Amino acid sequence: RIQDRFQTRLNLTAANADEVVRKRVLQKTDTADSSLSIFYGQHEVVLRNLLSFKNAATMHLYSSPASFVSDYPFIPYQFELMGRVLTAIRENAATGLNLSSGERSQLALFMKSAIALKEERIGVLAPVPLFYDALKGFVDSIHATVINRAEEGGVLEAFDVEVLKLLFMIKYIKEIPGNVDNLTTMMVSRVDEDRLALSKKVVASLERLIRETLILRSGD
């Protein structure tokens, strides 16, 4: 289990939020280091083909066994992305609750999301919508109500709601357009994911969300 691969120690003294997360939430045992390095070596090409972005700013992906070990089950681009998401929500869609922009907020996001995956076995990856549960308490009622109604309406599939959460999270982030390629990458949840099948699933969800007037069609 992923849970068995971490040695979690919390000490918020680092200046850099992603380093805080890596050192205090994602620190692995020696045995886990070895297992994850071997796993990466076996799946490096698969991961390279699975994770890609189109017309986006630089989004860092796994670059080596060490990169995979240090960030797993998260993907390197998610650290910078979630920093941008925190800023965007604070500026555009936040409640009156305190949502700081520093390392404590980002640590909380990754810690809660890591806990959600703690029973999973090696091979799972964190999809971006997983972070929404850690964010939703800070989202204003206008935005939160739309997602809550989508969850409770009984018309949409569960995957549709996850896509809706993702679209909300990147709504104000110009560095990563919400095209099908990028949405597909951010919805990846397993190393053995069939990217083509996932892409078709994303397209079907977008069509249903458009039909329910929850989103508008824009570009690709």
Predicted regions and their residues:
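A short helix-turn-beta junction within AAA+ P-loop NTPase domains corresponding to the substrate/partner-engaging
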Residues: R1-A14, V25
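Short alpha-helical "packing" element that flanks the helix-turn-helix/winged-helix DNA-binding module
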Residues: V163-L167
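Short, hydrophobic-biased segments on the C-terminal half of alpha helices
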Residues: V203-E207
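Short, conserved secondary-structure transition motifs
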Residues: L12-E19, I210
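Short helix/loop capping segments that flank catalytic or ligand/cofactor-binding pockets
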Residues: E19-V21, L81-M82
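C-terminal helical "lid" subdomain and adjoining coupling/linker elements of P-loop NTPases
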Residues: A32-I38, V45-V161, I173-V180, S189-L198, ...
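Metal-dependent DNA phosphodiester-chemistry modules and their immediately adjacent helices/loops
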Residues: V20-D30
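Minor-groove-contacting beta-hairpin "wing" of winged helix-turn-helix DNA-binding domains
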Residues: D220
